[in-house]
Amino acid sequence: VRLQAALSTCPKGGTVYVPAGRYRTASLFLKSNTTLYLEKGAVLLGDNDRTHYPILPGVLPSENEVDEYYLTGWEGNPLNSFAGLLNITQVHDVVVTGEGTLDCDAQNGDWWVNPKIKRIAWRPRAVAMVDSENVCLHGITVQNSYSWTIHPIFVKQLDLLHFNINNPYNA
């Protein structure tokens, strides 16, 4: 809750700095013109209780109330899914950097048990990006993802630089 509050109130051009330590969290949502800096030894550890994650609808109506807007999905279909550990949705100029770790900790929950069966909603991604621009992930490690690790949809100018993905083969 505190980390999301810091992200939500971060001023334009500001940085949310996460020092070394382990921080249990569910879904975090970034906003435009901000940086999330994970110091070496900082671990954002995903919550193992799926009921702590918001459910995102697969499709939303657009502002003109005629067209639809794809928000999330499963296997290419617009289906309700849990929000990811890190969500970058309809924003621009976002940086996630440092030498810290996003650890979904999925192996210690039930995320990988019968993974093709929907339980409440479809599994989240570690980093979910939708309809965003100028996004950079730099230097971080992402591991033990619930399902897809890095999932960009309609993202322009995405830089993935010097980062690591560590997942078991059966994740």
Feature roles, as predicted:
Residues V1-A171:
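Extracellular/periplasmic carbohydrate-active domains that bind, remodel
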